[in-house]
């Protein structure tokens, strides 16, 4: 059964069950700021599930195009190397919005999969999983479907917390959630792997083909599971996976759709068609994601979605280069894709020329730097070592347009570790330079001469407001239309503008069907707030009456982290000393980053004490009070102030019981107990005398602690320790044993070197004035040096050149007895040899080392040394 037929069968089946066939939404989620790309069938129905939107139907079915590349869900590095990872895939789904629930969802899935009228998959090839506490779903499978109990697997909380399970779905920390039931297909005992929940579950024998999510509860901020008044259903079945089942193949790349694309890739690159060639699969996958993204309006750029697209294109082009194709080829595959998928997705046909042009332009642009960049990278890789430095990776990115994951991909092929942390340091330094250059421009770029903004956000999360000004492309306009990016100024705002290290609020400004998504809030002038974002629907005009609403979840997280920062500041001064001053901060919903003046690293004991003091203040649950007062009165309270900061005549003083008093204009919790758990997760130096501390709070801190606990358990298992207390002793014993073995190995190598050296000197060529040894031996660079030093020390007239090859790289070491260095110099000798094997080197007259890359030329080089030395002795 062809993939295209499967797609149609699925939609037809659910249409016969009263479902409305809904067209796939765009890969660009226009109404969900939390998503980079559409990555699941339910994305377009998220507001329906949350109760914010109503549809004229209560049952729906879709074939949804999805992309997983960039962001939280990123399959990019695995694509081409596994049977089922893709950047683009199709998710078949059926949905119930308060209509049917578990019974019908399970019966529908079973009928479609096993009925002779539809897919007719043998029932004994299928297995179901249910959440451990979901007796209702278990009994439906057992008593109504008739599945044997041994093929119904209960999966419990296997991710470290209550309801953290492969079989319990959650939209977020709060909101709709519920158990799920998954259907697995058995690819046969000849393939390794076990059933879900077994130690071998990561194998490829049992593959999930359908997931039925039962949205049954609404989880509140206290973690309580409250039953939803109208439970709903969200299901998903990967089209490529079920196609592999129906076409009796194991890898998704073996299905009809991919087979034709793979042959097209081989045709355009000139490479032989081999299923085991990862580069063919990479390119075949990437032409799908790139073409569909461009069709949905994404173009290659250096930011956001456009940069993810650029990364995918350049990865495909690099794999073409690897296959021997240096000319633009990628765009030529669009026609083949249109032939395969244009019937189901007419936008591919409609925009074929635009897609081809965009891809060709990007290919041509990258071709200008690809060869030079590859040469730089190859040169860095052949120098040896197990790590590629962050500076090189950044240079490839910044100068030659190599995305990080492209370089990491190449390193992976060579078993070399990319220095991601070093690359990030270079990136952060570049961002800091950019921020410094833009700091004035950011506040002054929008012209405005109207009334000031009245900030209501300390006490209100929602205001009724009037639009005072609108901006698009930095210019004042009278209206914003759907899809426009811009800024809005309103008279009353609940949105906090970025200041004092706290990021700006996000949320929505709306009126009826007109909706502006606020993605950032910045000060245009000292007392004028600009809400920056996108008009997601309708139109916004100057003078409109609107409702402005802050995103509560993100605001609450910002408040928790900001209040925790104040407590941490005070605790740091108490623990480290009064010399500690704030040098910078960044408060976001995810964490708080705090820079302080301190001459040395903060010790583990000091960090623990700071954490204890902050959590003690949180447990006290004291009120957080803010008051506006004169600077004179503020000074009398002992409030902490930032050195060099300019303050007005009146200031806002924030007091947290007796724990902290500080000047601050930010938003904060009502009581310290609202912060929840506080945990410092990193500490390090960023400049001379400046330390950076990062901390997290609330559920983020809990998740971090749970991850550490899981890591400890993994270490215990790996070291075969009995308890946590035994782990350190096990590791220390292992390290001591390894050190002893290293010493023993070094001693053995030294003995071998002495024996080998004596034999070499016995076989030396007599040149009259000198004895010449020119040979290749098995040794590393350190051993070569030791042998050469030993030989020249035993003779008054020795000229030595020893070579070794390790992992394809040539090591050379030359030595000359000191009485001969007036005529023959070791540095000249090693340079002469290194140049012939593609390397360079040098050193002292009596001892020198070098390296090279062309091991094939080594025998000829060693043969040529006799004539070179002989000429020097004349």
From Swiss-Prot:
Localization of this protein: Cytoplasm
Keywords of the record: Aminoacyl-tRNA synthetase, ATP-binding, Cytoplasm, Ligase, Metal-binding, Nucleotide-binding, Protein biosynthesis, RNA-binding, tRNA-binding, Zinc
InterPro entries from the UniProt entry: aa-tRNA-synth_II/BPL/LPL, Ala-tRNA-lgiase_IIc, Ala-tRNA-ligase_IIc_anticod-bd, Ala-tRNA-synth_IIc_core, Ala-tRNA-synth_IIc_N, Ala-tRNA_ligase, Ala_tRNA_ligase_euk/bac, DHHA1_dom
Binding annotation for Zn(2+): 562, 566, 664, 668
Reactions mediated catalytically: tRNA(Ala) + L-alanine + ATP = L-alanyl-tRNA(Ala) + AMP + diphosphate
Record's cofactor remark: Binds 1 zinc ion per subunit.
Organism superkingdom: Bacteria
Main location: cytoplasm
UniProt entry tagged with the keyword Ligase: yes
A biological-process GO annotation: alanyl-tRNA aminoacylation
Enzyme class: ligase
Example of a GO cellular component annotation carried by this entry: cytosol
A molecular function (GO) term: zinc ion binding
Cofactor(s) needed: Zn(2+)
Pfam family, one: DHHA1
EC number: 6.1.1.7
Keyword Isomerase on entry: no
Family to which this protein belongs: Belongs to the class-II aminoacyl-tRNA synthetase family.
Role of this protein: Catalyzes the attachment of alanine to tRNA(Ala) in a two-step reaction: alanine is first activated by ATP to form Ala-AMP and then transferred to the acceptor end of tRNA(Ala). Also edits incorrectly charged Ser-tRNA(Ala) and Gly-tRNA(Ala) via its editing domain.
Domain writeup: Consists of three domains; the N-terminal catalytic domain, the editing domain and the C-terminal C-Ala domain. The editing domain removes incorrectly charged amino acids, while the C-Ala domain, along with tRNA(Ala), serves as a bridge to cooperatively bring together the editing and aminoacylation centers thus stimulating deacylation of misacylated tRNAs.
Full protein name: Alanine--tRNA ligase
Organism: Neisseria meningitidis serogroup B (strain ATCC BAA-335 / MC58)
């Amino acid at each position: 059964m062809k993939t295209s037929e499967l797609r149609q069968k699925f939609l037809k089946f659910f249409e016969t069950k009263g479902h409305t066939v809904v067209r796939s939404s765009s890969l660009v989620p226009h109404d969900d700021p939390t998503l980079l790309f559409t990555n699941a069938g339910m994305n377009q129905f998220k507001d329906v599930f949350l109760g914010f939107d109503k549809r004229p139907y209560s049952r729906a079915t879709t074939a949804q195009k999805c992309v997983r590349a960039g962001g939280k869900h990123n399959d990019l590095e695995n694509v081409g190397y596994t049977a089922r990872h893709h950047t683009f895939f199709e998710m078949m789904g059926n949905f119930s919005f308060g209509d049917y629930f578990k019974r019908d969802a399970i019966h529908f899935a079973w009928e479609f999969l096993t009925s002779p009228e539809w897919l007719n998959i043998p029932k004994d090839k299928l297995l179901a999983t249910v959440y451990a506490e979901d007796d209702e779903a278990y009994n439906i499978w057992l008593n109504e479907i008739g599945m044997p109990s041994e093929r119904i697997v209960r999966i419990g909380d296997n991710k470290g917390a209550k309801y953290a399970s492969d079989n319990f779905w959650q939209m977020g920390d709060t909101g709709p959630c519920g158990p799920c039931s998954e259907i697995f297909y058995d690819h046969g005992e000849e393939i390794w792997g076990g059933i879900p929940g077994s130690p071998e579950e990561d194998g490829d024998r049992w593959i999930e083909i359908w997931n039925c999510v039962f949205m049954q509860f609404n989880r509140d901020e206290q973690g309580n599971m409250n039953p939803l008044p109208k439970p709903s259903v969200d299901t998903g079945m990967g089209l490529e996976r079920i196609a592999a089942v129906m076409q009796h193949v194991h890898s998704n790349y073996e299905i009809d759709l991919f087979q034709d694309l793979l042959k097209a890739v081989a045709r355009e690159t000139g490479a032989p068609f081999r299923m085991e060639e990862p580069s063919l699969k990479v390119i075949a996958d990437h032409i799908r994601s790139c073409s569909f993204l461009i069709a949905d309006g994404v173009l290659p750029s250096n930011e956001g979605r456009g940069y993810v697209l650029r990364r995918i294109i350049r990865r495909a082009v690099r794999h073409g280069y690897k296959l021997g194709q240096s000319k633009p080829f990628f765009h030529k595959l669009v026609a083949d894709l249109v032939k395969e998928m244009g019937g189901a997705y007419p936008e591919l046909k409609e925009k074929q020329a635009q897609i081809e042009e965009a891809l060709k332009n990007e290919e041509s642009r990258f071709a200008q730097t690809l060869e030079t960049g590859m040469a730089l990278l190859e040169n860095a890789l052949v120098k040896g070592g197990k790590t590629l430095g962050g500076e090189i990776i950044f240079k490839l990115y910044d100068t030659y347009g190599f995305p990080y994951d492209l370089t990491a991909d190449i390193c992976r092929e060579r078993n070399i570790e990319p220095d991601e942390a070093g690359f990030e340091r270079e990136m952060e330094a570049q961002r800091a330079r950019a921020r410094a250059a833009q700091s004035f421009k950011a506040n002054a770029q929008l012209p405005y001469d109207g009334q000031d903004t009245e900030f209501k956000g300390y006490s209100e999360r929602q205001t009724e407001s009037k639009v005072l000004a609108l901006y698009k492309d930095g210019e004042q306009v009278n209206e914003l239309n759907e899809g426009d990016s811009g800024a809005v100024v309103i008279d009353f705002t609940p949105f906090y503008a970025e200041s004092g290290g706290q990021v700006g609020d996000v949320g929505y400004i709306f009126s009826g069907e007109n909706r502006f998504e606020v993605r950032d809030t910045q000060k245009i002038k000292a007392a004028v707030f600009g809400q920056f974002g996108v008009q997601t629907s309708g139109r916004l005009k100057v003078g409109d009456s609107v409702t402005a609403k802050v995103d509560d979840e993100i605001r609450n997280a910002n408040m928790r982290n900001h209040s925790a920062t104040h407590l941490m500041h005070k605790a740091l001064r108490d623990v480290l000393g009064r010399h500690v001053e704030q040098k910078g901060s960044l408060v976001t919903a995810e964490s708080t980053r705090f820079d302080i003046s301190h001459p040395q690293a903060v010790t583990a004991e000091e960090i623990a004490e700071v954490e204890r003091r902050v959590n003690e203040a949180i447990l006290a649950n004291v009120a957080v009070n803010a008051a506006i007062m004169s600077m004179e009165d503020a000074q009398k309270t002992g409030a902490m102030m930032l050195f060099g900061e300019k303050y007005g005549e009146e200031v806002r003083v924030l007091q947290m019981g007796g724990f902290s008093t500080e000047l601050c204009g930010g938003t904060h919790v009502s009581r310290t107990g609202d912060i929840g758990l506080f945990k410092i997760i990193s500490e390090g130096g960023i400049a001379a005398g400046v330390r950076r501390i990062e901390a997290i709070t609330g559920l983020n801190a809990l998740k971090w602690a749970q991850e550490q606990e899981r890591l400890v358990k993994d270490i215990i298992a790996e070291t075969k320790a009995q308890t946590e207390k035994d782990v350190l002793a096990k590791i220390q014993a292992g390290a001591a044993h390894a050190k002893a073995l290293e010493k023993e190995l070094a001693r053995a190598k030294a003995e071998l070197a002495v024996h080998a050296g004596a034999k070499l000197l016995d076989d030396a060529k007599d040149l009259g004035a000198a004895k010449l040894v020119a040979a290749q031996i098995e040794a590393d660079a350190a051993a070569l040096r030791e042998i050469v030093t030993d030989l020249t020390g035993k003779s008054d007239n020795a000229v030595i050149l020893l070579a070794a090859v390790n992992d394809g790289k040539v090591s050379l070491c030359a030595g000359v007895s000191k009485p001969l260095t007036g005529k023959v110099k070791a540095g000249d000798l090693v340079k002469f040899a290194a140049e012939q094997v593609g390397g360079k080197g040098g050193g002292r007259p009596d001892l020198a080392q070098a390296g090279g890359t062309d091991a094939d030329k080594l025998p000829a080089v060693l043969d040529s040394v006799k004539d070179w030395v002989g000429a020097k002795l004349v």
